[in-house]
From Swiss-Prot:
It comes from Rhodovulum sulfidophilum. This is Light-harvesting protein B-800/850 alpha chain. GO terms for cellular component: plasma membrane; plasma membrane light-harvesting complex. Residues 1-14 are cytoplasmic. Antenna complexes are light-harvesting systems, which transfer the excitation energy to the reaction centers. The core complex is formed by different alpha and beta chains, binding bacteriochlorophyll molecules, and arranged most probably in tetrameric structures disposed around the reaction center. The non-pigmented gamma chains may constitute additional components. Belongs to the antenna complex alpha subunit family. The chain crosses the membrane at residues 15-35. One of its GO terms (biological process) is photosynthesis, light reaction. GO terms for molecular function: bacteriochlorophyll binding; electron transporter, transferring electrons within the cyclic electron transport pathway of photosynthesis activity; metal ion binding.
Length: 63
């Protein structure tokens, strides 16, 4: 194991929760940016799947 010496510097009781919190924050930020920067994602999350799929299909056909 290459990273075994890391636990000599950082205790596992601190390092593992810190890693999990960092992953959760990164995941939240990715989803937040998707909702803020795309029109269809917000529509999909609000429940209007039909309109979201129509917009997605229209943009695919135009490009």
């Amino acid at each position: 194991m290459n990273n075994a010496k890391m636990w000599l510097v950082v205790k596992p009781t601190v390092g593992i929760p810190l890693f999990l919190v960092a992953c959760a924050i990164a995941s939240f930020l990715v989803h937040l940016m998707l909702v803020l920067t795309t029109g269809w994602m917000g529509d999909y999350y609000s429940g209007s799947f039909e309109a979201a799929s129509l917009v997605s299909n229209a943009t695919t056909l135009l490009s």
